[in-house]
Swiss-Prot record:
GO terms for molecular function: peptidyl-tRNA hydrolase activity; tRNA binding. Hydrolyzes ribosome-free peptidyl-tRNAs (with 1 or more amino acids incorporated), which drop off the ribosome during protein synthesis, or as a result of ribosome stalling. Catalyzes the release of premature peptidyl moieties from peptidyl-tRNA molecules trapped in stalled 50S ribosomal subunits, and thus maintains levels of free tRNAs and 50S ribosomes. TRNA binds at residues 15, 64, 66, 112. Its EC number is 3.1.1.29. The gene is pth. PANTHER family: PEPTIDYL-TRNA HYDROLASE. The record marks 91 as: Stabilizes the basic form of H active site to accept a proton. This is Peptidyl-tRNA hydrolase. It is found in: Cytoplasm. The keyword Hydrolase applies. Monomer. The record marks 10 as: Discriminates between blocked and unblocked aminoacyl-tRNA. InterPro entries: Pept_tRNA_hydro, Pept_tRNA_hydro_CS, Pept_tRNA_hydro_sf. The lineage of its organism: Bacteria, Pseudomonadati, Bacteroidota, Bacteroidia, Bacteroidales.
Amino acid sequence: MKYLIVGLGNIGGEYNGTRHNVGFRMVNALAEDGGVQFVEARYGAIARMRVKNAELILLKPNTYMNLSGNAVRYWMQQENIPREQVLVLVDDLALPFGTLRLKPKGSDAGHNGLKNIAEVMGSIDYARLRFGLGDEFSKGRQVDFVLGRFTPEEEEKLPELTKHAVEIIKSFCLAGIQRTMNRYN
């Protein structure tokens, strides 16, 4: 089976290491775990790897976050991957920092990347792995928070959290979403 694993983030060096780019961080950790490198391709950087009998297409869209749907649709069509075999890795302000939550579908929760993917797909029925950022920001400072860098304390915890995310992603591809949610959520 073939899966499309999409890490959401903003392109450009100024966004490296920001909270909003934690989707890129998770997909980078997966590529590193698989010993594969990303190459520039249409609509983003792509890497290919295998996990047992599953073929994974890893995607970091090079569109801005709010246009991620174009990249997702293109690679779904290019690789003939059904929506049930797409997993989007995304940041989430509604979850406490470091919480990882796998969902089979759902609203965009105010996330412009998820909103655009749903608009382009015409459906909210696609899986997402949400990485909790927490809500430790003053009213009206949400944008500054997500575009800001992790604190040193948070940064120290990220390697273990991304390792855990890699386990969840692999389980999604090998055991399916329901068994993976039962085990990890």
